[in-house]
């Protein structure tokens, strides 16, 4: 199976952040990773691959080297995408004989694209098993819902950018009739439990659209959730393919980037530093050696970037702008929305050059602020040189996004080279990698 088809399978099988984390963990355990639990003491073995999960939606994987290591080579991406979260009181009666699902927006999505297309629901539920509470993933794997738009005959402004009210216009149709509790019954059946054992839910809408390849020569890929599952996939593949050198490789997949990252499983948490400190302790590093290891560390923050739009090139900076299929994008911002500086940009560019991977550069147009990402958030907790990168795409945060088919291979190749390096500083302050 080639890289694009493997990516498509990962995208199609990861309708929510919970499924994305579960599929990433499954790939790691298939490669021999030993699962650790934060609530237990760790005993680390040399040469062993490990994975630890938090909140069913974030994970950190690492491989303990056979010998001493200088520091940590880290990469981070995120498992979530803009969508709609189903409320705990899920059913909402509406005009006529229809029953709608009560939802609210999650993140900053382009919501109009969600209208008039088949949708469904997936996520995690908490259930009672005897005297235990356990989480279980669910996916209603069929065309279940639709958010109907208003006919042009009733709203002549529909093609003029009419504003959508999420409390009025964006509630999906669930069914006909007023049968109370029908949705809860459906979820309990999907979880394989009796209704009284279904205690709580975290469910999200997802489009039923599958990932596809388009273009005269298959140059493009079109799929939901490319931001940021394309980077999750590329970093994961590179992490698994690498042959570690003198640094300890670490892969972090965070959740909740689309809503600010300030959750216990987000980049603005202690998750990564908690894991690194426990690695240091398990490898016998004292406080002084731990600080030296951090000083000899590096991070790649991987979150997709904006390509120049064929219909609106004016939104791009007039200098250098990324194109689909043109390679990995290094992102820069004077106000530190991206963490790339001269040092981190040079390190990653040099690695890509040696790996034969093309590099592009991106800066927001000076009068368009753009968004922030994982790098500047995580470095507030762990002060290491960090480069913000991504793969170029169009229609970011739309229900379906477009990217270049060749770029995923570039990311896998670059991350394989990156995780195989030995990054540290010499006695003169120079960087050895």
Regions found by a protein language model. Give the residues of each.
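N-terminal hydrophobic/helix-forming segments and targeting peptides
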Residues: 1-433
């Amino acid at each position: 199976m080639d890289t694009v088809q493997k990516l498509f399978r990962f995208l199609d099988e990861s309708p929510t952040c919970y499924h994305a984390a579960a599929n990433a963990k499954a790939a790691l355990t298939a490669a021999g990773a030993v699962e650790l639990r934060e609530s237990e003491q760790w005993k680390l073995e040399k040469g062993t691959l490990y994975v630890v999960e938090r909140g069913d939606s974030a994970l950190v994987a690492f491989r303990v080297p056979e010998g001493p290591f200088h520091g940590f080579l880290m990469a981070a991406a995120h498992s979530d995408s803009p969508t709609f979260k189903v409320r705990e009181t899920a059913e909402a009666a509406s005009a006529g004989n229809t029953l709608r699902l009560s939802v609210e927006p999650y993140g900053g999505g382009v919501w109009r694209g969600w209208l008039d297309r088949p949708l469904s629901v997936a996520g995690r539920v908490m259930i009672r098993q005897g005297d235990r509470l356990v989480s279980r993933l669910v996916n209603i794997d069929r065309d279940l819902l639709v958010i109907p738009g208003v006919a042009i005959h009733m709203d002549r402004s529909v093609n003029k950018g009419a504003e959508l009210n999420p409390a009025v216009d964006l509630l999906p149709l669930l069914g006909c009739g007023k049968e109370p509790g029908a949705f809860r019954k459906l979820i309990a059946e999907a979880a394989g439990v009796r209704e009284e054992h279904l205690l709580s839910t975290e469910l999200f809408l997802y489009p039923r659209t599958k990932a596809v390849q388009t273009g005269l020569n298959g140059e493009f890929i079109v799929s939901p959730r490319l931001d940021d599952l394309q980077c999750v996939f590329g970093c994961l593949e590179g992490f698994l393919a690498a042959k570690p050198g003198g640094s300890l490789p670490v892969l972090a997949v965070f959740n909740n980037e689309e809503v600010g990252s300030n959750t216990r499983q987000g980049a603005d948490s202690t998750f990564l530093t908690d894991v690194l400190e426990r690695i240091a302790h398990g490898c016998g590093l004292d406080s002084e050696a731990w600080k030296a290891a951090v000083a000899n560390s590096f991070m790649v923050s991987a979150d997709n970037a904006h390509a120049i739009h064929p219909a609106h090139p004016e939104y791009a900076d007039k200098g250098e702008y990324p194109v689909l299929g043109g390679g990995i994008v290094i992102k820069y911002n004077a106000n530190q929305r991206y963490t790339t500086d001269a040092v981190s940009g040079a390190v990653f560019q040099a690695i890509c050059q040696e790996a034969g991977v093309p590099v592009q550069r991106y800066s927001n147009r000076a009068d368009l602020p753009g968004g922030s990402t994982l790098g500047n958030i995580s470095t507030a907790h762990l002060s290491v040189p960090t480069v913000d990168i991504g793969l170029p795409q169009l229609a970011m945060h739309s229900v379906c996004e477009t990217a270049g088919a060749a770029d995923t291979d570039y990311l896998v190749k670059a991350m394989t080279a990156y995780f195989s390096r030995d990054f540290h500083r010499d006695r003169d302050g120079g960087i050895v990698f």
